[in-house]
Amino acid sequence: CGWGSVSLWIAEHFPNSQVTSVSNSQGQHDYITKVARSRGIDNLSVHVCDMNDFEAPGTYDRIVSVEMFEHMRNYGELFRRIANWLEPDGRFFMHIFCHRTTPYEYIDKGPSDWMSRHFFSGGIMPSADLPHRFADDLNVEKHWQWNGTHYARTLRAWLDRMDSRKASVMPILRDTYGEEDTTRWWMRWRMFFMACEELFAMNGGDEWFVGHYLLRKVEK
C-alpha cells in the first residue's frame, strides 16, 4: 500500500467499509497509522508483511494493487492467491506501469545497470498484455491504458518538489545512506526521476505507460 494514499482515501470516503492494507515497511505502517488517527479514521488496519508471505485474515469484495506487481515475478501464483481472497462476486483492480509489447526483468548485469541495482532490484517491467496471460484464476474484464505523458509530468513534479526542498531532503538521505553517500544518493534520485520522465514521454507516451485492469474470479 506504499504510504497509504489509496487506503486512506478509500477508508475516508467509504466509512462503512473495512480496509486492510499491506506494506513491507514498518515506517510506512507507522505513518499510515498516524495519519489515520489524526483524521479520525477507524476502519483501516495496516499489516507489515512481505506479500509473498501474506495470509489474508478474511475474504474481500474488492482488492486493489497499485504498482506492486512490478516488484513481483510469479504472477500466476499471486493471481491464484488473490482469487482465493476474493468473494465469489468480488473484483481485483490492478495498476501497473508497463511497456507496449515487451516484458523484461530488471537484472544487474554490470556497471551501467544502476536502475536495476539501486531502484528495481529483482523487479520486472510488465508488458501491457501480461495480466491477460495468467487466466487460470482471474480473468481481465476491462483494461485501460493511460498515456505515458501523464506519468512523465508526475515524475517531473516529483523532481521539482525534491529540488525545491533540498535543504530538508539532504538530512534524510544522510540518515538513510550515510554521510559519505549523501550527495551520491541525491544525484541518483535526480537521475531516477529524469530517466523515468524521459522513458514515459518517449514516442508521445505510447511506448511506456500505465495500465489499469479490472479482474474477476474464474468460475471453476
Language model: regions and residue ranges:
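A short glycine-rich, Lys/Arg-flanked "PGG" loop and its adjoining helix->strand segment in the class I
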Residues: 76-91
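Conserved SAM-binding loop
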Residues: 32-33
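A short SAM/SAH-binding and catalytic strip from SAM-dependent methyltransferases
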Residues: 62-74
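A short acidic, Gly/Pro-enriched loop at the edge of an enzyme's catalytic core
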Residues: 52-63
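Substrate-binding/catalytic lobe of Class I Rossmann-like enzymes that use SAM or dcSAM, i.e.
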Residues: 98-100, 104-210, 216-220
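Conserved SAM-binding motif I beta-strand of class I
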Residues: 18-23
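Conserved SAM-binding strand-loop segment of SAM-dependent methyltransferases
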Residues: 38-51
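Conserved SAM-binding loop of SAM-dependent methyltransferases across substrates and taxa
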Residues: 3-15
